């Protein structure tokens, strides 16, 4: 397959789209093609590979072992092609084109506002924003899937990072919570803790705090988003550890309160992260400079 790659770049893009969506129809919609056209291209790729790349299990489309292996190579090639385009743009001093940014879910509360300001100054930029949990973002960094990332706890490698702004983590409760005095984690052992899914940065931090303090919560409820957790806390379902950046409005109008817990807030930081060795186009370099400048004014 690799020796045919220069003649079949579009086929690789189609294969990548189907692998991401695990759906021919959704991939076709993204690419602006018909579903039969996408299916035909996949059949041609399978003929070149000499192995089936997808298998249908009932109504679910899955990658075969061959498909999974090929996908890694295809994404490496597509990333290299993208980097080559950016290198050529850099030589031309181009400050437009596509810019793909990934942010952890907690950062979605402030990242769109910053990106809106940036794109106003760079109207030629086609901006793509991907929101995911920490574990998924780490996978994207490893795969060189996007240009840059914003996250709270960056990997040690293979990435370079720059500190952006403070990200204090606090314990919050509904406004009618009875106890607000100085608390220890043992005082909270009778509470219901609302937590994100495994792989989330806040979930990892909360579990570490519980382990460090030897606390076994009375009850834990898992939820898939910070927004759902905030609504549940305001409804009195329990308490949660969240980034203060995610709830400025709720705190200002008194819907949530910060509990006075010993050892909190935990002072963390936001970082902009770039995969080590990645060539940044001028527009990406401009974005990094903008984010650093914006952080200094926060």
UniProtKB/Swiss-Prot annotation:
InterPro entries recorded: LysR_subst-bd, Tscrpt_reg_HTH_LysR, WH-like_DNA-bd_sf, WH_DNA-bd_sf
Organism name: Rhodospirillum rubrum
Domain HTH lysR-type residue range list: 7-64
Similarity comment: Belongs to the LysR transcriptional regulatory family.
Signal peptide: none
Ranges of the DNA-binding region feature: 24-43
Protein name in UniProt: HTH-type transcriptional regulator CbbR
A Pfam match: LysR_substrate
Gene3D superfamilies tied to this protein: Periplasmic binding protein-like II, Winged helix-like DNA-binding domain superfamily/Winged helix DNA-binding domain
Alphabetically ordered keywords of this record: Activator, DNA-binding, Transcription, Transcription regulation
Gene Ontology MF, one: DNA-binding transcription factor activity
Entry-linked SUPFAM superfamilies: Periplasmic binding protein-like II, Winged helix' DNA-binding domain
Function comment: Transcriptional activator for the cbb operon for RuBisCO and other Calvin cycle genes.
């Amino acid at each position: 397959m690799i020796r045919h790659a220069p003649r079949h770049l579009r086929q690789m893009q189609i294969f990548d789209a189907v692998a991401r969506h695990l759906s021919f129809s959704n991939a076709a919609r993204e690419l602006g093609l018909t579903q039969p056209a996408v299916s035909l291209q996949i059949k041609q790729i399978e003929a070149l590979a000499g192995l089936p790349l997808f298998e249908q299990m009932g109504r679910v489309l899955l990658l075969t072992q061959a498909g999974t292996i090929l996908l890694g190579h295809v994404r490496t090639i597509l990333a290299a092609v993208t980097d080559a385009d950016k290198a050529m743009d850099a030589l031309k001093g181009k400050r437009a084109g596509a810019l793909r940014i990934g942010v952890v879910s907690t950062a979605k509360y402030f990242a769109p506002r910053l990106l809106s300001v940036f794109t106003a100054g760079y109207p030629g930029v086609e901006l793509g924003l991907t929101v995911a949990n920490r574990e998924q973002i780490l996978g994207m960094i490893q795969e060189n899937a996007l240009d840059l990332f914003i996250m709270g706890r960056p990997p040690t490698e293979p990435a370079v990072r720059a500190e952006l702004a403070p990200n204090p983590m606090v314990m919050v409760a509904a406004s009618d919570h009875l106890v607000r005095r100085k608390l220890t984690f043992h005082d909270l052992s009778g509470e219901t803790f609302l937590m994100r899914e495994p792989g989330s940065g806040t979930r990892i931090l909360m579990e570490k705090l519980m382990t460090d303090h030897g606390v076994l919560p009375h009850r834990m409820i898992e939820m898939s988003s910070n927004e759902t957790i905030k609504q549940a806390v305001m409804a009195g379902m329990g308490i949660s550890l969240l980034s203060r950046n995610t709830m400025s409005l709720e705190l200002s109008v008194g819907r949530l309160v910060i509990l006075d817990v010993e050892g909190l807030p935990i002072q963390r930081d936001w970082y902009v992260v770039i995969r080590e060795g990645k060539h940044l186009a001028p527009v990406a370099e401009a974005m990094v400079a903008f984010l650093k400048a914006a952080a200094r004014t926060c």
